[in-house]
Amino acid sequence: MAKGFTVKADVPKKKAAPADEFSIEKAKELIRGKTVVFCLPGRGVSYIFLKAFVQLCFDLVQSGAQIQISQDYSSMVNFARCKCLGANVLRGPDQKPWDGKLKYDYQLWIDSDIVFDTEKFYRLVYMDKDIAAGWYCTEDGKTTSIAHWLEEGDFRKNGGVMNHETLESMSKRTKPFTCDYTGFGWVLIKNGV
């Protein structure tokens, strides 16, 4: 530095990252003493799924939750979901899950191709909503499982397809939001809904 000069400057201030309101400890408090029924439609899973599922089960039990598993298969996924709930089409439309005989606080639906971890589960719990879903990409890698209704004219213009969120639009979202449609691949439902 040149003789006679003194540099006086403040350290540049870092912009604070937006605070994530999520607290895993609060989510653990919400789930303590509760029963979660894992609803698993399908025939088989990958080792990636299996490792994540076993870890989630372990973490929930360690947090003081109880777990149950309801798994069934049909080539028609909507029927497989009904079977997971113990439903029977011959008993009509007014049925309760497992005929009301299974005591539970939450149903957690996980499709066999979903990649997840325990934190993602706790984020659903932390929302404390009747229905909370996580999003995931569909097979094209660009469209997501989340959609919004369109006005009838716009629906026709869109080829009869709802207005789905894209990978790009979801990357801009930082907080939970309301949607009109969600896939059932990763969804948490409270008892009584």
Stretch-by-stretch model annotation:
Residues 43-45, 72, 114, 121, ...:
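Residue-level marker for beta-strand->alpha-helix junctions and adjacent short loops that shape enzyme
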